[in-house]
Amino acid sequence: MNTVCTHCQAINRIPDDRIEDAAKCGRCGHDLFDGEVINATGETLDKLLKDDLPVVIDFWAPWCGPCRNFAPIFEDVAQERSGKVRFVKVNTEAERELSSRFGIRSIPTIMIFKNGQVVDMLNGAVPKAPFDSWLNESL
């Protein structure tokens, strides 16, 4: 499996049976699967979408109340699914070009990508259980 280091964006090849062995980046030594949510920019998102893991992106804005309420749920699920799914946030205020590129019209909008392609989308904040169920169905 190829995976992108969230710290330096280097592509790392990891045998599938070693994913849970605290894999580290070959370039910078950062943990590859730390369960952290990645704040993506226009510069980093395309690289992250090349990851062999599914990528879940939360398009949000700092002024959006539902976005702020959903953030801890997104972070909890990212921790729980570490090494299985990448979780990414895109600030639509700071990254307007990405909002336009992905056709974001309401926030929060959560999109799932596999092999760089959108496979599902969810508009609006949801509680943790429905979010988990949606991920299970979509992944």
Curated annotation (Swiss-Prot):
Protein name, entry field: Thioredoxin 2
* Cellular compartments per GO CC: cytoplasm; cytosol
Q: Which CDD domains match?
A: TRX_family
Mention any Pfam family matching this sequence. Thioredoxin
Q: Which domain of life is it from?
A: Bacteria
Q: Which UniProt keywords apply?
A: Cytoplasm, Disulfide bond, Electron transport, Metal-binding, NAD, Oxidoreductase, Redox-active center, Transport, Zinc, Zinc-finger
**What family does the database annotate?**
Belongs to the thioredoxin family.
The cross-references to InterPro entries, in alphabetical order and at most eight, read:
Thio2_N, Thioredoxin, Thioredoxin-like_sf, Thioredoxin_CS, Thioredoxin_domain
> Its catalytic activity?
[protein]-dithiol + NAD(+) = [protein]-disulfide + NADH + H(+); [protein]-dithiol + NADP(+) = [protein]-disulfide + NADPH + H(+)
List the unnamed zinc finger ranges: 5-18
Q: Could you tell me what this protein does?
A: Efficient electron donor for the essential enzyme ribonucleotide reductase. Is also able to reduce the interchain disulfide bridges of insulin.
Compartments, as annotated in UniProt? Cytoplasm
Q: What EC number(s) is this enzyme filed under? A: 1.8.1.8
Q: Where is the Thioredoxin domain?
A: 26-139
Q: Name one GO molecular function term.
A: zinc ion binding
Q: List the disulfide bonds.
A: C64-C67
Q: Which residues form the signal peptide?
A: none
